[in-house]
Amino acid sequence: MDTSPPEPKLSALYQELILDHYRRPRNKGMLEHPTHAVSLNNPLCGDEIDLQLLVQDAVIRDVRFVGRGCSISQAAASMMTQLLKETSVSQALTLAGRMSAMMQGDDAAAKDKSLGDLRALAGVAKFPVRIKCALLPWNALTDAFKSPA
């Protein structure tokens, strides 16, 4: 695990990255034959996500989502789906744990390059009311593995 610090003072770049994923979400849509699917919402703010995965041989071959809500939840879903394609289920669950740690203010997790673009969301940890927004897709992911489609 690489824990090199992100480049200093990139908050404006990170904000732009979040807005880009919100405005042009990656992997938005539904799968024809998912092996795992779950719908979750955040009753506090109204964010919603339907997450679908195609898992073969313990590897996430495809992942899609449909959702609506704030820029944080939708960008987090877009970033997550990009990161998870062709990732093992065990690695995906490890990443979910790292994301959760980052949202709890864990500096090592925030510097973990395995989180990719999701590191742009590290600043959300300073706003407790928004943490659930950033974790909604990850909670959907862990729930999806509890019950196949």
Q: How should each PLM-predicted stretch be described?
A:
Residues 74-75, 94:
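Alpha-helical macromolecular-interaction surfaces
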Residues 67-74:
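Short, thiol/selenol-centered motifs that function as redox-active sites or metal-ligating centers
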Residues 49, 78, 132, 136:
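Active-site phosphate/pyrophosphate-handling residues
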Residues 45, 70, 133:
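Functionally engaged cysteine thiol sites
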